[in-house]
Structure formats: C-alpha cells, structure tokens
C-alpha cells in the first residue's frame, strides 16, 4: 500500500485529531497537578534544561506525536539531510549547514564529495586573515590599523551574524577581545542605514565585508557601491583593495568590483542564506571582531546540538520535541503565532533571526510534491527580551489571544551586578520573572480567587485570567560562544522538524521572488520618468496614483546627479 501523499491523510494525524477534543476540555491546572507527567516532560542535554510540562498535552499526546513523527518518516528525513541528499528538491540541492561546524576530521558528503575539507580551508583562511587584521599586519591604504568593520548583507547574510554579535558583546572573553574594535551591519538599502553605519567612522581605519553569494543582490550591491564611493572619495580608488573584502562565490564579479579575488571567502550552494551564520557569512565578521578562537567555540556549540539531533531518541531529543510541539500547537490547537522571550538582553536579536529562519522556511502553502496543504503550517514568530516584553505585549498573551511562548533563561549572567542592601541581585530580579510568567500563563486567576481577595464585583471580569496558555522553558547554564551556538542549532533543527513533519520544503524561499520582480518594473519606471520624463504606464490605478504622487513630490531630484553621500 502506497504512503499517503499528505501527512494529514495518515492514521497518526487522524488519531491526534480525535484526541484533540479531550485535551481541549482539560485545563493546564489539571495537567500540572500530575507530577509524574511533569517529570516526564523535562529533558536535559549538556546542562541545557527543557521543561515542556506547560504545554496543552498529556503523556498520551506526546506518544501520539511520536507516532506522527514515525508516519512522517522523520528519522529518515533527518538522516537524508545529514547524508547530503538533495532534500531541497525545488532547487535540487543538499542542505548541509551541519557541515559548516563539523570537526576537521569529519566526513559529510554532497554529491559524493566530502565537503568538510573545503569548509576548513575557508575557516583556516578566515583565521589567518582575521588574525592579520587584528594584530595590525594587514593595514589600510594610509598605514592605519583596521579597527572597525562594516558587514554589508541582507536577510540571512545579516540577521544571523547580528544575533551572534549582539549575544557575544557582553560575554567577558569576547568583549575583552573586542576592546577598541567595532562591528556594524549594513542591510537596508535605505540611505539612512548607510548614514548610521558610517557615522563616526574613519574610512582609513574601516574594513568593509560585502556578503553576497552571487554578488548580484540588488540591495547589498547598491550599499557596497555606496561604501566603495565613501572609501574612494576619501582615500582614492586604489584603496578599495585594502579596505574591502568579499564573501562570495562569483570571483569574476568580485574582481570587477575592485576587490582582489584572493580576499574573497567562499560558501556553497548547499548553504541556505538563513542557515549561513556558521559559514564565512558570519564567521568572517565575527572573527574580525572577537578573534577566531571565540567564534570556534560558537561553532563547537552548534556542532554539539547537531550530534544530539542526529543521534538522540525522540524522547530525549530537544529539537525534535520542540518541533513536534510546534506542529501540535499550529496544526491541531490552531495557534498561529509563537513568542520567543529570552530573559537575557544579550539575546535581543534572537527573535528577529528566528523569525526569518522559521517564517521563510515554513511559510509554505503546498507540500514538497506541490499539493495544497489542507491544514495550517508555519507560525508567526515575534519576541522581545524579558522583562521589556512584559511591559509591551504580554497583556495580549495573558488576556487576549492564546500565543504559545518560549521562555529562555540563563543561570549565570554575563555581567552580574550586586547592590548592598537590595533584597535580590539584578539577575535574580530578572529570573524571578522568568520563573513566574509561565505559571501565570498556565494557571491564570479565577473569579473565585478574586472574590476571596475582595476584588470589586465590576472589576472581576477585567482581572480574571483564563490561564491554559502553553509555554516551554529552556534554561541555559551560561551564555558564552558555545551556548550561543547550541541555542542557534536548537532553533534551526526545530524548524526543520516542523517542515519534515508537515511534508514541506523548508529550504527554498520562492515567496521572496515575486515582489523582487515587480520592484524591477517599478525601478525601470522611476528611471524613465526621472531621466526621460516618461509618464507612469503599465500599472494598476492604485499603484499608478502612488507612483505619480511620489515622482511629483520628488521632482527636485536631479536626473543625472553628482555623487552625494550621507552627512551625519
């Protein structure tokens, strides 16, 4: 008998659907009263502690989710990814970001070739180059040390490295290594982003890293040309070779741009942009800022989770458990969003990065075979560090829509503060909220409790909390390069698990193409209208009206302008 074309046609899926009604009638207050259940929903790996007992799930639910994983051939799909099979079928590519952090003596193959030696050739090149820049043996055109770096990229070439950079900034070892240096990221084509990035920097001491696999990404290359002009106007065109390097595979275009191809750092088609932070995309700028040794620990942390993900049983496998629970929340309980709530300011850029990893990967409406999905998949990811989020959007989470939450806590702060006479130290104050919020969401507060507190009758409806709002808690022992790598890999693999179960391709992103192609048409129109005075044609009434309004209001923009750079 042939396997069902869609996971929703399997008996395991139907069994979970039938099971759903009983769970909906069971409040988390009741589920949390079962100590044995709670204990079974706690998993530890390498001092990372996961507690998923506050999920709207019984032990029976979890067992049924394991059966769903089996029906989806989850283990086989994970193995196929690690074996280099072309699981990105629409682009006919392997998906091997795990190879980017594999030890030097590993063997991971794509199309019959072990790619790990190539990975380490690039890593060795990054180490050598970053060491030379940091110790002053590679200097700028005027003989000054290059102490400031601007990394130019967009999407996965920016969000992942920015997350890791922000997380490392306050780590004692990393911050010591970065003393006197600055790393900035230029992503948006908005000239304001250029202005902010070059503000306060001296071209003589600035190195620009241009990140574009093809060296044709429109936004990135316009920003790169802008920074090239910033350097050339101050130091002369020949300075570009000393002040700009590339992360790209298109060496002819790199050379044409004015960058010596020797100073181009490769990555490969089997690395998707949103999974590329462990490639030269992230490793080069991060090594320039913090030194290769710190970044290598980050890679080792990610690799430890890669091993855990590929070898641990589902019952003990943190990414698998998180992925299955997300499928349960989205496709069965019908919750469309997820809040990522790290109780560490160092993780303030985690949610924006995972937003891309998750939503670009799993924001699909058809199966890997092109069949429309008859169920909800993908989730809307957002988040903010605690306790900031508590004073922002937690109101909705507590008394509005049900939004499953990821609470992430760190046992030891990167920067502890103790004040004499305070009841608790600053980190304990933060963590008090980390421990309290999941229970507040799970248990809520009943009208009966409010009456016992003598709350006015007319206020009781406003102060009632329904509870029964699911969350998971992840407790990390510390937050250094190694643990940051682990956290990244947990979320990467969680997203893959969801896609594998839903039967979609989590590794393409055709959704970004349509808007880009329409922007090309608009770009041509703006050029024709500004340079030749041609009327706006070929657009619907609404777009035509907006374009005409924009062109009229910017009629003072010269048709053939002289170069003008931001002045800030």
Swiss-Prot record:
GO terms for molecular function: carbohydrate derivative binding; glucose-6-phosphate isomerase activity; monosaccharide binding. The active site is at 360 (proton donor), 391, 516. The keyword Cytoplasm applies. It is an enzyme of class 5 (isomerase). One of its GO terms (biological process) is gluconeogenesis. Pfam families: PGI. Its main location: cytoplasm. One of its GO terms (cellular component) is cytosol. Its EC number is 5.3.1.9. Keywords: Cytoplasm, Gluconeogenesis, Glycolysis, Isomerase. Pathway: Carbohydrate degradation; glycolysis; D-glyceraldehyde 3-phosphate and glycerone phosphate from D-glucose: step 2/4. It catalyses: alpha-D-glucose 6-phosphate = beta-D-fructose 6-phosphate. It is found in: Cytoplasm. Belongs to the GPI family. Homodimer. This is Glucose-6-phosphate isomerase, cytosolic 1. It comes from Clarkia arcuata (Glandular clarkia).
């Amino acid at each position: 008998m042939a396997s069902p074309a869609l996971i929703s046609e399997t008996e395991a899926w139907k069994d979970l659907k039938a099971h759903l009604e009983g769970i909906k009638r069971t409040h988390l207050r009741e589920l949390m009263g079962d100590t044995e259940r709670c204990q079974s929903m706690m998993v530890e790996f390498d001092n990372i502690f996961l507690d998923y007992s506050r999920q709207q799930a019984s032990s029976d639910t979890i067992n049924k989710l394991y059966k769903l994983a089996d029906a989806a051939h989850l283990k086989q799909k994970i193995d196929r990814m690690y074996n280099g099979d072309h699981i990105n079928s629409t682009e006919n590519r392997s998906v091997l970001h795990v190879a980017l952090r594999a030890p030097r003596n590993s063997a991971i193959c794509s199309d019959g070739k072990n790619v790990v030696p190539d990975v380490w050739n690039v890593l060795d090149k990054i180490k050598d180059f970053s060491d030379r820049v940091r110790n002053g043996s590679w200097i700028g055109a005027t003989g000054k040390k290059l102490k400031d770096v601007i990394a130019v990229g967009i999407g996965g070439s920016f969000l992942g490295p920015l997350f890791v950079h922000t997380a490392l900034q306050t780590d004692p070892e990393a911050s010591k290594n970065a003393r006197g240096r600055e790393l900035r990221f230029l992503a948006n084509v908005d000239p304001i982003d250029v202005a902010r990035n070059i503000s306060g920097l001296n071209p003589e001491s600035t190195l620009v890293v241009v990140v574009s696999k093809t060296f044709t990404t429109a936004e990135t290359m316009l920003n790169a040309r802008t920074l090239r002009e910033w350097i050339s106007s101050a130091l002369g065109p020949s300075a570009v070779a000393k002040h700009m390097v590339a992360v790209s595979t298109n060496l002819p275009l790199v050379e044409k741009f004015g960058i010596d191809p020797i100073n181009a750092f490769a990555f490969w088609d089997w690395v998707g942009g949103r999974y590329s932070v462990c490639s030269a995309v992230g490793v080069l700028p991060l090594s320039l800022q913090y030194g290769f040794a710190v970044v290598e620990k980050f890679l080792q942390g990610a690799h430890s989770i890669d091993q855990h993900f590929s070898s641990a049983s589902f019952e003990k496998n943190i990414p698998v458990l998180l992925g299955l629970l997300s499928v349960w929340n989205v496709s069965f309980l019908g919750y469309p969003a997820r809040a990522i709530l790290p109780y560490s300011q160092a993780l303030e850029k985690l949610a924006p990065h995972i937003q891309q990893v998750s939503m670009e990967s799993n924001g699909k409406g058809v199966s890997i075979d092109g069949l429309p999905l008859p169920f909800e998949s993908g989730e809307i990811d957002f988040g903010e560090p605690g306790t900031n989020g508590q004073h922002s959007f937690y109101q909705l989470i507590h008394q509005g829509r049900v939004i499953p939450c990821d609470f992430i806590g760190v046992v030891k702060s990167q920067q502890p503060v103790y004040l004499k006479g305070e009841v608790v130290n600053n980190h304990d104050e933060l963590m008090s909220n980390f421990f309290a919020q999941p229970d507040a969401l799970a248990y809520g507060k009943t009208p009966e409790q409010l009456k016992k507190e003598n709350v006015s009758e007319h206020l009781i409806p406003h102060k009632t909390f329904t509870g029964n709002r699911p969350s998971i808690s992840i407790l990390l022992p510390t937050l250094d390069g190694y643990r940051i790598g682990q956290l990244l890999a947990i979320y990467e693999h969680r997203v893959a698990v969801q896609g594998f179960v839903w039967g979609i391709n989590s590794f393409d992103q055709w959704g970004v193409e349509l808007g880009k192609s329409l922007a090309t048409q608009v770009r041509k129109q703006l050029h024709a209208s500004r340079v030749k005075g041609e009327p706006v044609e070929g657009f619907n009434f609404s777009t035509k009206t907006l374009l005409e309004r924009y062109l009229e209001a910017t009629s003072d923009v010269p048709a053939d302008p002289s170069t003008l750079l931001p002045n800030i």
